[in-house]
Amino acid sequence: MPREIVTVQLGQCGNQMGAVYWQRLCAEHGISSEGILEEWATEGGDRKDVFFYQADDEHYIPRAILVDLEPRVINNILASPYANLYNPENIFVSKDGGGAGNNWAQGYSAGERIYEDIMEMIDREAEGSDSLEGFMVMHSIAGGTGSGLGSFLLERLNDKFPKKLIQTYSVFPNAQEGDVVVQPYNSLLALKRLVNHADSVVVLDNGALARISADRLHVQTPSFDQTNQLVSTVIAASTQTLRYPGYMNNDLVGIIASLIPTPRCHFLMTSYTPFTSDQIDKAKTIRRTTVLDVMRRLLQPKNRMVLTTPSKTACYISILNIIQGEVDPTDVHQSLLRIRERQLANFIPWGPASIQVALTKRSPYVTTNHRVSGLMLANHTSVASLFKRMLDQFDRLRKRNAFIEQYKKEKMFANGLEEFDDARATCDELLKEYKACESPDYVSFGGPDGDQS
């Protein structure tokens, strides 16, 4: 029996990503922009009801909740050909429409005001599921709504549904060129909630997305649409084994359990290959896609969707490759042997050094130019360099108490700035834990003789 997942899209970024993701899911399941199953979509074998449910008139509706504090992006969705796909009762735009002013504290306070409206939608979706497995949250952590309101909702979802999984797709800001001056504050405050209240966080680093888009598309500055197509391809591929199930990894808990051996280190990187013009406008083609070729490309640092600082000690904690297409399992076995012989992947010294592979069939309704494609979900210690970058940027602002007044206007910061210090400490502990994973005695980390209690 399929276990349903409710998607919560927050803010400008979350709703832009979500809109393209649902277009992609509709295409992969033979569902029209109005939610009607196409006459030619007769293949079966897919599980639509993990992410969709059927209305009384049989058309398919995403199990999605769209929330924003300003109306522009949701208005665009409602003016698009997919306007009738969504349940109008599951769309929330703040009445004053003023947004969160790129301020985490404003977004968080807005959460307290609109909590009941949003929770009513979430409860309705949860109750409409036969066997809810969990939530997927799409957001950015740089601005106000995705980071602040996102933080508030993560806390509440965790309180209200303690046994349900929460997987986030979180866009981290581009370190080089952020358009929000206070993004180091917003990001760190949101990161604390991602550490404490999410079971798994797929890290999408804007800097890396821009670099991969530029590399694949031959353009200096890729458009928002192109970057969102990139992201939606990755999100759709990461849910492929839930929608086209095989023997393993056919529910969220199976995927998370195989990737996250210790609870705090749950920040995952992704690589995908090949990106082609089927998915992204103007993508250059890759001629050859054997299983070995795809698996080798997935391990190349330049294909990772997180910009990390190279380090000799960095290593994989776990890898899950989701390979799509008509693939012979012997090819997979041979490819894994070749990768091991050439030592293309460096693993932690205290755990199993193996690449897990999930084979999944591809949607019969989407034609592609390539035989095999692959997504890698990896837990890698070099993600610590992303947290280090965030800490350094935060410290630079905090040292001067720059822009603090904007935060003090909100209730949470009215009596002091402990929340900032607490968020910084959480990030620092996370950084230390990922670094500790690189040493053989990590197993005693956090014990009486370890670094933390």
From Swiss-Prot:
Example GO biological process: microtubule nucleation
SMART domains found in the cross-reference section: Tubulin (SM00864), Tubulin_C (SM00865)
This protein's record includes keyword Metal-binding: no
Subcellular location: Cytoplasm, Cytoskeleton, Microtubule organizing center, Spindle pole body
PROSITE patterns (UniProt xref): TUBULIN
Function, as annotated: Tubulin is the major constituent of microtubules. The gamma chain is found at microtubule organizing centers (MTOC) such as the spindle poles or the centrosome, suggesting that it is involved in the minus-end nucleation of microtubule assembly.
Keyword list, A-Z: Cytoplasm, Cytoskeleton, GTP-binding, Microtubule, Nucleotide-binding
Family membership noted in the UniProt record: Belongs to the tubulin family.
Annotated protein name in UniProt: Tubulin gamma chain
